[in-house]
Structure formats: C-alpha cells, structure tokens
C-alpha cells in the first residue's frame, strides 16, 4: 500500500487540467501513442467543445520513479465547475492529494479557490503546479505570490511545467510522490467503499467508480448500499487505465469500478458507501448528501407529438445524470412538457444542449426559476418551483427566497462596475479583500437574480476577467410577487414570472412591450396586460389589421359606406370572441432578455 498514490487535479476552466492529465497518462504509458487523443478523459463531445469536465473519470497508472520503485498512481479527474461542486467534493474525498494547477500567465481564479478550499477542508494534501510556463506571458513569481496570498499554502517550491510541450511533467509526478501520503486503510476490515461516480452502460448496467477505504472486494461477493439498503451480487471489479481492465479483487487504498447488474442509476448514488451484505460495516463514510436541484425550468417539445420522445430522452439522460430531476407538466400555452430541476445554470445549458444534440429534440424552454418557500395564511409551508403554482396573494403569509453567497474575483480596475452590478441585483456586500492586483468580493445575492443573466452580465462589465462561484446559504423572507401576463384577458401561464415587488411594475411593462413587438398583428385588437393579483400594472395594445372595405365604393351615398364599415366591425367583434392568439416561441425567450434597470 505504500506505493499507491491517489490524487486529483484542481484547476480553473482552461488552465490546462485535461492536457496535464493527458501528459501524465502518456508518461506512465497508460495508452499506446496511437490511442492518445486530446483530452482523453473528457468522453462527451460537449465536454471537449466547451473545454470543461462534467463527469469524473479515473486512470490507474504505474510509474517508475527516479528512486527505482514502481508506484501505482490513481488519477481521479474532477469536474471544475461550481454547479458540480458536490461531485468535486466526492472525488476529492477519495484522494490523499491534489495537484493545484495554476496558469502561470493568469494566476488564481475563483473556481480554483472554491475547489481548493474544499480540498483543504477534506484534509487533502495540495501540491501547487504552475502550468503554461512556455508562454511568453507567463509570470511564475506573480502566480506563486497569488497562490500564497489567496489560498494560503506554501508555493515557493511549486513545480513548473508545460503540459502542452510535456516539459517538467516528470517533475510533477516526482513531487506528487514525495508530498502526497499513501492511503491508510485495512484490507481485512469490513468493506467500506465510497462511490465517486456512477454511469449507465448499455451492456452491463450501472458502472460504479469507487475508492476502497477499508476491506477487500471480489467478484461474486454480495454488496449492500448503505443509503438505500439494496443488495446486489458483484459481477466484475477492475480499474481503468483509461481503458477498463478486470481484476480478481480490489482492496483498501485502490480506486476502481464495480459492475453489479444494477439497472437504476438512482440505486448507486454518488457519495454513498458500499459494504458487504453479510459482514456489513458499522457505519457509512461521512459526507453523503442528497443533491437538491436549485434551478427549475419547463422544457416543452415544439411539436406536440414529440412528447413521448422527449420523455424517453430525459429518461436516458437521467441514466447518466442522477442529479437531473423532472416531472410531467401541462401548460395551457405550450401543451404537455416537463418541469426539470438542475444543479445550476451550466447544468441546465448542458442538459438542453445534450437533448438537442444527442436526441435531436426541438425544445421550448421557459424562464428558469428558483424554489420559493411560501408560508400560507393557514400556517402550512409549501415549496413553489413553478410560478403557476404560486397561491393567490390573499392566501400568502410570507414568501422566503433562496439567498446565495457569491465569491467574485477580478482585477481591481473592474471593482466599481462589478459592485454596481451586484447592487442592481439586490446584493448586500459581506467582504472585500485585496490580493495584489486581484480583488475578492463576497456578496449575498438572491438566487433568482443570479439565475436570470448574472453570469453573462458579470463577464460583460468586467470584459471577461471576473470569475465567480456561489453556494446556497439560506432562505430569507422577501417581498416577491407573481406577475401574470394576460392576452385578451386570458392568463398565459408560461409567461408568469416571480419578481421582487420593487421591480414588478418595471418588469411587467418591459415584458408587455416586448410581447407587443413579437406577437404578430391579428384581424382584431389584442390587449396585452401585466397583472399582480387583480391589479393591472401595464397594458399594451396591438392594433388590428383591417381590409379597406370601402375600396370598391366610388362616390355614392355615405350610408352605403357606413353599412360596410358596420358590417366589418361586427365581424371583428365576432372574431375576437372565438379567436385565439398564437404566441410565437420568441415571446417566451423575451422574458429572459428583459434587462433590469
């Protein structure tokens, strides 16, 4: 066991995490040269394109060190984005060490810091590495200073490397072996294995990626999940050297996979503990929690007959993404669809993109909303994740909205504009620190404000230099109201929005004005109204198109013309009673694009 090292790599998007992983795999001979491709561990196309890692992957590598011994290195690749922070904490708790990769030309960024703190809290040894030192813009001294300043770990002897050219990668491995402690654990104790990740394979069912903490696991053993109590017979165990390789047993300290013929991904929850059914461990490993969705949106097929196809696609996606939740929903305006829950905005975008890409779906997405806690006047509390389910204003005692703590990092030139943005978003400043040229701002902002367009606006006010991460803090009482949109007196449920009272009139007016531009003119007048309860706050009219019925009258008597105009008026009136207004897809997106003033 002294020759095992379990480690993961922490880095901000585009600081070269996946490239470094590729180089390490190459140096250790995990894949033949012809199988080497860029970003080996990012298996989804969308992961490669966006340059992000979504699912955790592992590689068990053997490396002959300079002291002549052969070490088994288990690389656990972690997602770097804040939406997947729970997956990150599970991957990190399976390691004893983490390589902190910092781009020598850019310095420390927000998500690196968030994940690095997670690592330090879990007691993981952090080994700093400066990447991209082959760039002319690289400034290693500055980067070292930032690491010590912002994260507070000693980085004077940080290893320097360039993952692109392969320079210094062996030094990284050497310092890893020297600094990271070997795993502790007893192969003879009752089995405890932490599920780092799980995914669905069409041939063998669910594959669980585990770190064995104590005990030994062999095929044909009966295992039990400690969160659910379900039992399964083990079919195969083994390791990935990115390619899977079956072994006779996995014992304490190793990272590998278990295949046990599990059909449902929900049975193998990330962070759960696996133990033997017969000789069970006394207690599960700490840190398991159910992941709760933070952001909700309605997904509807553009063609009504695609509903079943959408359901199947969501079922298939759920096989590989246990944190995705969905339930059927009916909207008067959009027909049948699903209310889906996501971990955050990036997660939502990825799910939509995968549905459109891998399953060829055409989707309409409603505005994303967050979950409100509503205390009704009879004292009961309900959770509302859909504006349509918000009770009438008279039945509400108070509404609490989720507040998140946001950490922002940016160069000091942009502090002013970022603070202005946070104030607009009803944020309250908690802290502000200077680290050299970088500034760290901490704000508490309502989640609803972040969901809308906070990230995009943050990037635009800071010219792309600011980075952020957020975590849920608490529910707090707030004066929020539901704004309904009425078209010719009929409520359109999919256009309802929940906003703070201070912005409700403004948002109502804006949405009404947007709708007026988007809805095509009809044969009769269309009234668009925004209402809070029974109180109308805004109205826009779309004038009717009319045919010139007098074109055929030359001269003649006025009564003749009057008769024709009256007849036209009657017709329009009748039309208005039976007609329904088609609402184009853009109208639903219009809500998203309303800027806060």
Curated annotation (Swiss-Prot):
Q: Which Pfam families match?
A: EFG_C, GTP_EFTU, GTP_EFTU_D2, LepA_C
The primary location reported for this protein is: membrane
Domain tr-type G: where? Answer: 2-184
**Where does the UniProt annotation place the signal sequence?**
none
Stated EC number for the protein is 3.6.5.n1
Q: Which domain of life is it from?
A: Bacteria
Listed A to Z, the keywords are: Cell inner membrane, Cell membrane, GTP-binding, Hydrolase, Membrane, Nucleotide-binding, Protein biosynthesis
The record gives the membrane topology as:
Peripheral membrane protein
Record's subcellular location = Cell inner membrane
Briefly state the protein's biological role: Required for accurate and efficient protein synthesis under certain stress conditions. May act as a fidelity factor of the translation reaction, by catalyzing a one-codon backward translocation of tRNAs on improperly translocated ribosomes. Back-translocation proceeds from a post-translocation (POST) complex to a pre-translocation (PRE) complex, thus giving elongation factor G a second chance to translocate the tRNAs correctly. Binds to ribosomes in a GTP-dependent manner.
Recorded protein name is Elongation factor 4
Q: Which organism is it from?
A: Burkholderia cenocepacia (strain HI2424)
